[in-house]
Design a protein with these regions (language model features):
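An acidic, glycine-rich "communication" segment
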Residues: 64-67, 76, 81-84, 156-261, ...
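Alpha-helical scaffolding within the catalytic cores
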Residues: 103-109, 132-138, 206-210
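Aromatic-Pro/Gly-enriched surface loop or interdomain linker
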Residues: 55-119, 126, 229-230, 237-239, ...
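Short alpha-beta junction capping motif
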Residues: 119-162, 166
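Bacterial N-terminal signal peptides
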Residues: 36-51
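Structural recognition of the beta-strand scaffold that forms the well-ordered cores
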Residues: 69, 118-122, 148-152, 182-184, ...
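N-terminal secretory signal peptides that target proteins for export/translocation
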Residues: 1-35
Length: 295
């Protein structure tokens, strides 16, 4: 992966040259000790001036930008809450300054493009159609490469249990990952601590205190929610929230947004405590691709 090269900033260069010129004068009239202290002071001043100079903003779509891509299967054409992914990106950017894609993509489970990015958002309010062999293969490859899939049930039962969408997705995931069973993860898991400290999971509805996850190599590869997180995020064309949040109103919505931010940060960082950037997903994908000379 090539580093992103940036043009030199003339203001930074100017500040640096000024400091160098002052130091090169030898600060006449001062003793050697005072001259040494002066060198240190001017060098520090130069670093401060350089640091204060605004840096060019990162372009959308830079490597590492968070893209809450909508996963589509069967005849599905969009997320259950179509405006939620873009709002997710906006909230993440405004609260953390993390790079985001402002217009999240849509990707089908049987497309090779699924493995172009390390995150996919699968939401719905009705039962999904049985996955095709190609969809199963695509999702299995995505997870095996280290991708994170977030499953958001937009229509759970009143009790907080999975609705038709959630139940059917779990059935299909058992076909994708037959050797893995979802387990409950609560406030002790890093997802609840990546950026905000959260005590429980919440969305448009209160639901269970925990999320469910399919763990692969110690990492939550699939995260399942029966809270309609997208419903808490979605805004209409007027800028007003599209759906009421029950029973906790605005305070619950804020905590739901914080959970969405934490999930995004979990995707961007493979290990929060060590502050490590997410593992190079694209490099792993390319390592498994045949070279052009192979049939």
């Amino acid at each position: 992966m090539r580093p992103i090269l940036r043009p030199r900033d003339p203001m930074r260069r100017s500040a640096s040259l000024k400091v160098q010129s002052y130091i090169s004068l030898g600060l006449p009239g001062l003793g050697s000790r005072a001259r040494k202290l002066g060198h240190i002071f001017l060098a520090g001043l130069g670093l401060a001036l350089a640091a204060a100079t605004p840096r060019p903003a990162r372009a959308f779509g830079d490597v590492g930008a968070f893209d809450p891509r909508v996963l589509l299967t069967g005849s599905q054409t969009d997320a259950a809450r179509p405006d939620a992914p873009a709002r997710w990106a906006v909230e993440l950017e405004s609260r953390t300054s993390a790079p985001v894609r402002h217009r999240p993509l849509r990707v089908r489970a049987d497309e090779g493009a699924l493995t172009d990015e390390p995150f996919a958002y699968w939401s719905g309010d009705k039962a999904v159609e049985p996955l095709t062999a190609n969809e199963i293969s695509g999702l299995r490859r995505f997870v095996s490469l280290g991708g994170v899939l977030f499953v958001d049930d937009a229509a759970p039962e009143a009790s907080g249990a999975a609705g038709p969408f959630g139940r059917s997705v779990r059935t299909e995931l058992a076909r994708v990952l037959p050797d893995s069973t979802p387990i409950a993860i609560g406030s002790e898991h890093v997802i609840f601590r990546t950026f905000y400290l959260l005590r429980r999971a919440e969305g448009r509805i209160l639901g269970a205190r925990t999320l469910d996850a399919i763990m692969r190599g110690g990492k939550a590869a699939v995260v399942l929610s029966e809270h309609d997180l997208g419903g808490a995020l979605a805004k209409g064309v007027t800028g007003a929230w599209q759906f009421p949040v029950t029973p906790g109103g605005d305070a619950q919505r804020e905590r739901a947004i914080r959970l969405a931010v934490n999930i995004a940060m979990y995707v961007l960082c493979s290990n929060y405590k060590d502050d490590q950037v997410h593992a190079p997903f694209l490099m792993r994908r390319r390592a498994l691709e045949p070279s052009p000379s192979e049939p």
